[in-house]
Amino acid sequence: MGRKLDLSGLSNNEAEHVLRVVQRDMQLRKKEEERLSEMKQELEEEGSRCLLLSKQQKFNEHCCIRCCSPFTFLLNPKRQCLDCHYNICKSCCSYSQSERGYICAACQKSRHLRTQSLEWFYNNVKSRFKRFGSAKVLKTLYRKHIIERGALSELPEVSAHEGSNDNGSICDGSDSTLYKQSEGHSMADTLTVALRVAEEAIEEAIAKAENYKDSLEKQNEARYLHEHKEELIEELATTIVQKIIQRGKRPEIQEEYEFVWPQNQKSELPSPTSTQNPLATQNSHSTSQPGAVAQSDISKRSRSAYSSDDSPEKGPEVGMAPGVPKSTEVETDIQNYSSLRRESRALSLPGWKSVDRLENSSASSVLQSPDGNWIALQSSQHSRPSLLTKRKSLVFSVLEKESGVVSAYDEMGSDSDPEDQGGWGAALLQFRRRLSDETYYTDSQHDPEWTFTQHPPITSPSSGQYTNTETLNSDSETSPSPSTRARRAPVMKKGPPETHLYPYYRHPADIVALPQLKPDVLDVNFNPHLGGDSSDGEERSEQVKRSRRRRKSKRETSEHSRAHNALYSAATAENSTVLLNAMMMRRQQSQENTVPLNHQTPDSVTSPDILTFNNMSPEPEYQNTLAHNSSAASLPLLSQLGSNNPGFAPQDPLLRAFPVNETLEEELKYKLSELIGQVSERDVKSSDFEPISEVGNKQEDRVSEKDSGKLRPKERRESKRESKLREMEKQSERQTVKLMDTSDAVRQINIERQMKKERERQRDIERQVERERERQRELEKQIEKDRERRREIEMQVEKKQERQKEMEKQLKQEQERQSEIERDLEKKRKSIRMEKRN
């Protein structure tokens, strides 16, 4: 095999006969591969299945990798295969005495496949010889054919990519590589050989990709080549056939490596020797001097039809002697042939490895063939050759897909979503915003940086919660204060309000549960000239500090649900408190104008927010219906004034009996009952305390009417009072009815919800029952099918028994016939003997 083979002395008929023999050899190999393809496919499927099972944690330690049966200590012990090193059971392996170990069934089958396909022979021969067998014969015949046509040798002894096991190489040293380029056969033979070459190339590419079991990219590549195998074979075969046809039509193009470009065209179209590495030639020389015509006996130069320099700027590698005119036909032929070469080169060198230096100092990269026999240059203008189909990395494709997926958290709602304005979401959002604003204002007033910067005033002095720096350092009479201002909710911090800052209110568990109100509260000041004293402001600031500290400590210990209840009850109590305080301030102003009193100085007047409780109580008949409002709305103004000023004495007998005028108290009760009736679950989301403003306007009108009616006799006042008392009774009854209705409605809603939930549960149970029934029906059907199969088997057994009986009868009859025949024969013999004796 290693010796030189010279077939130049063969005649044309002998060469055709040799080519037929080679073609028959290829056909036989194809049939053999088709016969072994089924076994290969089974082994591939088994290998992929075992690979998936082995990736599961500790699967092979407890179960067999082949039949998945669990291991037991005595009945089914585990044994390790010598080839695949997987744990297998007793039934899936056999003992090898020569190797003294166990081998599984799949590994035995793979060994059998290797022996039948002669893989060991080809691997050893390819490693020792560059070309052998039919490939060597085809090379010599093709070289002889080219020499006869007048061209120099294209394929010297070491000119092609020989003996390569590369996964995508077409010129790989196989027996069918050079046969496709010969012209001593028909077009059908050319097509079959081209298809065979393409199939071998793609099969080698698949085999090499499957060898890398650890690389996921190689596994995906092998899977892709398996799926598109037929398409790739057709494309590769068409390119091979086109190349053969073009070479047959244009014999002058075969001389492209025997000429050198003129010197004036070096800048535009470089010569082959200028773009090819001298290491790419083995035992070869080239005469590429400018201006010299290549000799016919030029030394053998490595001509690689699969050069890696695929730059579009590179012209066709055809050289002509200077002075020879170039015709248009030759130019078109060269362009067509170079385009065909580029198409075939794109699929020819997928396995060549880069041998660039680390510093990448060379202008063009260097590639090396897998067998180490060839080194070629690659132009820096194009990317390095890849596999037949260049696929994306799996990680890159997964990341690209995941980048367009919407996150599951984007579609989930939360109580912090600004678009969710209904229910507890809006209330909690509003509480948090106002809590942050309130803590900012209260904390920033004690910050020295805040005091030296310009900020708008926080709130009016009448609110009593926050003190402006101007009101603290100036007189209350001269300092202007806004008449009305939207005041922040004083209980935004989680915790109950202090008794010295707010009127008393009952615990939420003691009062009737009312719908939640928004904490937007109006701060009405009907006396703009009346403000708090500076000393009062300082005391309030200290009280604010104490309350803030207490709130912080309570916030850490209290639970979230109790904080919500405290916020709800505080907001409800504060709404009524602010309205009552505003009306009392107006009442006080009117009394100051009519009754001469000695408490006109601002020092004796205290803010309504620091008034104490338990100075008065409503009448007993209304105490039950309005307990949650009257307790929070008790008006201790006149008692506080009386305690501060001993000279103060009310003139009206009604005022002597009660600390506050009874008519005013009735009006307040009436207004509070209206407020309670207007508040409902529907007003929680949409109302902005519009009823409070309307009630305030009505109160102002009634107070003015009351002031004008003071000059009338007492009888009218008593009649009005009686009528108002009746109205109050009616309204209180209506109030109780409404509360009962709302409570009944809530109960009904809860009952309906529970009923719906129970119905859904019953439906789920019914669905489960139906599924179980369907499963039982399927089981019954399967049981019936099994019974029918058993009946059929029994019928067949009975038929067989009947046939056996018939056969036995026939045998008996034949035996009887034979016995009769024997008797007849004996009788005849006896008769014959008797005759002879006679």
Swiss-Prot record:
InterPro entries hit by this protein: FYVE_2, Intracell_Transport_Effector, Myrip/Melanophilin, Rab_BD, Znf_FYVE_PHD, Znf_RING/FYVE/PHD
PROSITE patterns, per the entry: RABBD (PS50916)
UniProt subunit comment: Interacts with prkar2aa.
Organism listed in the record: Danio rerio (Zebrafish)
Alphabetized GO MF terms: actin binding; myosin binding; small GTPase binding; zinc ion binding
ZnF endpoints (FYVE-type): 58-112
Residue ranges of the region described as Disordered: 263-331, 444-501, 525-570, 681-838
Its job: May link secretory vesicles to actin filaments. May function as a protein kinase A-anchoring protein (AKAP). May act as a scaffolding protein that links PKA to components of the exocytosis machinery, thus facilitating exocytosis.
BP-aspect Gene Ontology terms: intracellular protein transport
Classification via SUPFAM superfamilies: FYVE/PHD zinc finger
Superkingdom of source: Eukaryota
Subcellular location, record wording: Cytoplasm; Cytoplasm, Perinuclear region; Cytoplasmic vesicle, Secretory vesicle
Ranges of Polar residues composition bias in the record: 263-290, 451-484
Any single Pfam family the record assigns to this protein: FYVE_2
Residue ranges of coiled coil: 188-237, 714-833
GO cellular component: cortical actin cytoskeleton; perinuclear region of cytoplasm; transport vesicle
Protein name in the entry: Rab effector MyRIP
Entry keywords, A to Z: Coiled coil, Cytoplasm, Cytoplasmic vesicle, Metal-binding, Zinc, Zinc-finger
Bias (Basic and acidic residues): 697-736, 753-838
Span of domain RabBD: 4-124
